[in-house]
Each structure stands twice: as structure tokens, then as C-alpha cells.
């Protein structure tokens, strides 16, 4: 289960709302588990061919989950109608299947549909492979159809909310902004012991760390971070570059690191459990967000919470969250020299880093708390009669 999905499910379960969660079926994980008294998790998917995809890991993986979940709903529809009788709440990642199959489930069960868009194929995602270009019109249609049929649509930013209202021709009262951190106690997980453990585990010394946190996937643009690292190295900067994450594009990224002669400067941690992320961020002097598209970027809020400035591509809604020169630096996308310049500017000016961190620190708690998101979602459920 995705971290943000689990956080919201547990928040709402704590308010008395029972959940059945249909998620991926990883190897060697029980297909049916219970979390507390109000959460039941069912992991289902059909088999897929091992054809790599930078977007999904394997081609058709999200569709295989969606079809497997739909079959489970069909087989259990009588029991679900009696037991749930409330809503289907879909968390959408930019694939058409993640929106369309929950729409079918809502029709089968005769309940309202709530669509929560974490990444939108219809509004912002762009295909990166031939297969994705071929299927892109279908995926866009599927997402658009689902949001038009939904009782409520939840977007990450005001910009995305307004654009979805306009493009999908939806009434304003059906489309809302909902964004939140996975924990209101995120900063509390940072400890000196965890920082020391991370330094020892990954061989990090006292040189400045320029950090990337997130998935290694096509849409995240991590190759631009590597190109900036190469440019900074050519300029004589003695930095450590740490990629805290993993993902389907890692093999290609490792080839690029080798081609740029950076194997002794770049560390890829692989998957990192969430309790270590605050300490990893605190080890960095700054964090780079090189995404090709990014409506919100939860890592932005996490870095603000940990008082670390960001250098980010000016894509989608990023400049609505990072005020250039005040709470971070926003650079033109896909231009290595400008990104390297911004990183150097922050490395050379500790007072600027501290000032940006000070300006940004209050924002996450003020506008993106998990408890406030729970209040808002409870209100939305009431509005649609749940």
C-alpha cells in the first residue's frame, strides 16, 4: 500500500470509517491481512509478462492489479454491497486503469465514486516510450471518463483543481484540493542515531551532500540531477551526491552515472523505509527535485519540514509551492547549467540556506497536515451523502 494512501486510510479509520483496501500483490506477502479493527487489505493482481517499463516497473502491471481487483469485487459483490454500502475511493497514479476500473467497481456495487488524483495522465503526464504513446489516448479517455462520473474528485493543488474543473467541464463543487503529509510527526522521526546509522551504512563522510529523494522513474527526471552532478564535478565542487530511493529506471541511471565518471561520487541507497527519510533529508545541505512533471511533490513538504532548501524544476504546480528565492530556488526545466548554478549558490551561502528554510518551515503544518486532510475528507463524504 502506498505510504500516502495508508496514512489517509488510517486517519479515516481512526474516525470510525471502515476500509477495504485493494492493492498490489507483491511476492511472499499474504493476500489478505487486517490492520487494526477497521482496515482489511486484499492484495490482488493477474500475472504479467516481465517486460520492463520505466513508468510501471513492468508493462501492464497497474492494469493487472486493476483487473485482479475487479474480479475480486465481482466475486464478492453481494457481501460487499451489504458490508460497505458506502463508496469506492480510487487513488490514481496517472494510468487510465487506476481510475477506470474503480469506476467499474462503483457501478457493480451501486455506490458513489471518489477519485483522488496523485498524478494525472489527463492533465500533465507525458508518454516516454512507444508503448505509452500508443496507449496514451486510451489512458487519458479512461481517466477523464472516471472523473466525470465521480461524485467527488480530489486534486493535489489549486492549479490542478481549477484545470480539472475546466478541462473535464465539472462543476466547482465536485472538485476539491486535498494534499497532506504522511505524518504530522514527520520531523520527530529524525534522530542522531539514525543519521549516524545512515552515514555508516552508505559510507557518507563530512563533505556536503546534495540529495535527491524519491523514485527512480522516467517521470522523476533523475538523469537531470546526474547531469548537474557531472557539471558541478567539472567545476571542481567536492560534493557527495545521494539518491535516496529506487525504481524501474535504476539500470539506465547507473549506466549514465558510469558514463559520466561519477561512480565514486554518487550513492544510490535503494529502497529506504520511511522512518529513515527525515534523517536522510537532514544529512543533506539541500535537495534537488528534477521532475519532468510534478503537481505537488510530497518531498517538497518533507524538506520544508526538515528545514532543507530545494532546487526544483519549474514544472506544473511546483512554483505554487516553492516561492523562488524565498522558500527555495525554481529553475527552468531540463537545463543543466541553471540547475548547477542554483546548487552552487546554495552551497556557497549558508545564510541563504537558513533563510529559505526559515521561510518554508511553517508551510507544511499550516496547510498540509494529515489531521486537517481528514477533517476535509470527512466533510466531502458527508456532502455526497456518505
UniProtKB/Swiss-Prot annotation:
Reaction catalyzed: 2'-deamino-2'-hydroxyneamine + UDP-alpha-D-kanosamine = kanamycin A + UDP + H(+); neamine + UDP-alpha-D-kanosamine = kanamycin B + UDP + H(+); paromamine + UDP-alpha-D-kanosamine = kanamycin C + UDP + H(+); 2'-deamino-2'-hydroxyparomamine + UDP-alpha-D-kanosamine = kanamycin X + UDP + H(+)
Pathway: Antibiotic biosynthesis; kanamycin biosynthesis
UniProt keywords, alphabetically: Antibiotic biosynthesis, Glycosyltransferase, Transferase
TM annotation in the entry: none
Statement: the UniProt record of this protein carries the keyword Glycosyltransferase: yes
GO molecular function, one term: hexosyltransferase activity
GO biological process: kanamycin biosynthetic process
Pfam families xrefs: Glyco_trans_4_4, Glycos_transf_1
SUPFAM superfamilies, sorted: UDP-Glycosyltransferase/glycogen phosphorylase
EC assignment: 2.4.1.301
Enzyme class at the top of the EC tree: transferase
CDD domains assigned: GT4_WavL-like
Cysteines paired by S-S bonds: none
Function field: Glycosyltransferase involved in the biosynthesis of kanamycins by catalyzing the transfer of the hexose kanosamine from UDP-alpha-D-kanosamine to disaccharide precursors. Can also use UDP-alpha-D-glucose as sugar donor with much lower efficiency.
Protein family membership: Belongs to the glycosyltransferase group 1 family.
Protein name: Alpha-D-kanosaminyltransferase
Taxonomic source organism: Streptomyces kanamyceticus
Amino acid at each position: 500500500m502506498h505510504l500516502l494512501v495508508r496514512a489517509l486510510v488510517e486517519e479515516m479509520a481512526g474516525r470510525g470509517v471502515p476500509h477495504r483496501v485493494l492493492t498490489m500483490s507483491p511476492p511472499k506477502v499474504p493476500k489478505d491481512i487486517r490492520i487494526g479493527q477497521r482496515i482489511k487489505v486484499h492484495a490482488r493482481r493477474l500475472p504479467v509478462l516481465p517486460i520492463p517499463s520505466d513508468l510501471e516497473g513492468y508493462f501492464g502491471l497497474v492494469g493487472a492489479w486493476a483487473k485482479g481487483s475487479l474480479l475480486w469485487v465481482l466475486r464478492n459483490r453481494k457481501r460487499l454491497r451489504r458490508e460497505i454500502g458506502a463508496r469506492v475511493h480510487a487513488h490514481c497514479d496517472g494510468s487510465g486503469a487506476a481510475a477506470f476500473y474503480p469506476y467499474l467497481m462503483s457501478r457493480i456495487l451501486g455506490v458513489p465514486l471518489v477519485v483522488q488524483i496523485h498524478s494525472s495522465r489527463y492533465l500533465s503526464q507525458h508518454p516516454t516510450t512507444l508503448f505509452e504513446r500508443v496507449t496514451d489516448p486510451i489512458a487519458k479517455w479512461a481517466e477523464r471518463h472516471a472523473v466525470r462520473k465521480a461524485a467527488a474528485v480530489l486534486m493535489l493543488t489549486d492549479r490542478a483543481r481549477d484545470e480539472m474543473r475546466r478541462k473535464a467541464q465539472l462543476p466547482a463543487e465536485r472538485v476539491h484540493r486535498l494534499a497532506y503529509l504522511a505524518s504530522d510527526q514527520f520531523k520527530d522521526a529524525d534522530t542522531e542515531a539514525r543519521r549516524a546509522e545512515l552515514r555508516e551504512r552508505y559510507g557518507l563522510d563530512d563533505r556536503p551532500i546534495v540529495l535527491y529523494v524519491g523514485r527512480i522513474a522516467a517521470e522523476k527526471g533523475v538523469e537531470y540531477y546526474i547531469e548537474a552532478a557531472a557539471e558541478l564535478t567539472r567545476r571542481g565542487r567536492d560534493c557527495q551526491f545521494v539518491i535516496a530511493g529506487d525504481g524501474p529506471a535504476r539500470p539506465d541511471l547507473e549506466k549514465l552515472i558510469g558514463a559520466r565518471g561519477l561512480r565514486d561520487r554518487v550513492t544510490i541507497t535503494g529502497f529506504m523505509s520511511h522512518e529513515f527519510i527525515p534523517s536522510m533529508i537532514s544529512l543533506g545541505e539541500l535537495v534537488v527535485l528534477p521532475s519532468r512533471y510534478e503537481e505537488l511533490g510530497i518531498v517538497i513538504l518533507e524538506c520544508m519540514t526538515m528545514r532543507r532548501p530545494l532546487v526544483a524544476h519549474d514544472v506544473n504546480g511546483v512554483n505554487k509551492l516553492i516561492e523562488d528565492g524565498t522558500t527555495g530556488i525554481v529553475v527552468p526545466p531540463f537545463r543543466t547549467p541553471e540547475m548547477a548554478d542554483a546548487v552552487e549558490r546554495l552551497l556557497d551561502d549558508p545564510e541563504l540556506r537558513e533563510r529559505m528554510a526559515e521561510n518554508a518551515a511553517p508551510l507544511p503544518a499550516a496547510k498540509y497536515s494529515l489531521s486537517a486532510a481528514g477533517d476535509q475528507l470527512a466533510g466531502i463524504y458527508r456532502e455526497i451523502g456518505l
